[in-house]
Amino acid sequence: GRLMLITGNRGCGKTVLLRELQRLASERGWAVVSDSASLGLCDRLAEALRSNKPVVTSMEFGPSFGRMSVEAARAKGETLRGLVNERLKKLGPGKGILFAIDEAQSASIEELAALAVLYQQVLGDQDATGLPDSDQRGLALVFAGLPSMVDDLLEEPSVTFLRRAQQRTLGAISLPKVRDSYIQTVKDAGLYVDTETADLAAHKSMGHPYMVQLVGYYMWRSAVRRNLQVIERCDVEAGHADAISEFYEAVDAPLYYGLRSPQRLFIEAMAADEGKPTRMADIIERCDRTQSWASKYRASLIRERVIEAAGYGLVRFTVPMLGAYISDRILWHE
C-alpha cells in the first residue's frame, strides 16, 4: 500500500520506523521528502520538490498554532500537483515520491485535505498515461502520530482518506524477544551476556521500545568502561539508572510540560501512589477539587493516552515512569 498511518505513544519508535521506510524507499530509487506536520506543510513540501534533491528533510518542528483557509490550501495543493507530476517524469518506471510526515496530530486539517486531493489526483494522472501498473510512477504518503490525536483527525470529514490507510500501531515488545535480541546484539558487538542477565535487562526495559534501546546501550557502555567482555548484573543496574535519566528527559518531561495546568495537577496527585492504581476519590481529595473537575480531566488524560482506567473508580499511568518522574523531578522537595 502507498498510504500508511503509524500510531503509538511517545517513545514507541514511530520516528525510527518512519526513517527506516524512507531509507528503503530511497534505496529503491524513490524520491523522499520528510517533514513535520506543522502549519505551512504544503509550502515546505513544494520547496523540497523544487530543490530536486533525492532526499529532503525539513527542520521545521512544532505544533500548528494557526489555521489556513480552505481556498489557500486548495491552491497550494494544485501547486504541489504540478510539482509532483514534474518530478515524477524525471524518475524511472515504477518509481515515485514518498512524503513521510511526522507528528501528524499537529497537522492543519486544511493542508491534510489538500494532500488527500493531491493523492487522488496523482493516481488519476498516472492511470491516464495508459502505462502498465508496474511502470506507473506513484505517490506514497506515510504519516506518524500519537493515537488519540490521530483518532481526532480520522473523524474529520475532509480527511476521510486516512481511514483507508494501512494502520500500524506500535506498542510494547514481548520480554522474551527483548532478552533474545540483547543476547544476539551483544554477541554481534563482540561481548557476552548470559541468559539470566539478559532476562534481567529485558525486565528493566519493560518492553518499551525506547527503554529497550537505552538499557541495551548503557549496559554495554558500562561493561566497556570496565574493560570487560562480559556484561554482568552490575552493568544492567548501572545501565538502567542511566536509561531512566535519559527517558525522563526525552519522554516524560516533554509530556508533563506539554499538559495543561489542571492536567498536571491531576497526575501529580496520582504520582503519590508510586506505581499503583489511584482512586478517583483520592485525586479529588488531594487536589481539593470537585467530582466534575476530576471527571473532566480524567476524560482528557485518557483521550490523550496519558492515563487509563484500571477498574471501577481507578486510573493508572500509560506512559512508563511518568509517576516516578513526577515524584523524582517535580515533587521531590515536598
Regions found by a protein language model. Give the residues of each.
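Walker A/P-loop nucleotide-binding motif
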Residues: 1-20
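Winged-helix-like regulatory helical subdomains adjacent to P-loop NTPase cores
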Residues: 10, 207, 211-291
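Conserved NTP-binding/hydrolysis module of P-loop NTPases
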Residues: 26-32, 39-71
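Conserved Walker B catalytic segment
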Residues: 74-148, 155-158
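Short amphipathic alpha-helical interaction segments
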Residues: 110, 287-304, 312
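A short helix-turn-beta junction within AAA+ P-loop NTPase domains corresponding to the substrate/partner-engaging
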Residues: 155-171
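Conserved small helical "lid"/interfacial subdomain of P-loop NTPases
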Residues: 170-197, 204, 215
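Short, amphipathic alpha-helical interaction segments positioned at domain boundaries
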Residues: 247, 320-334
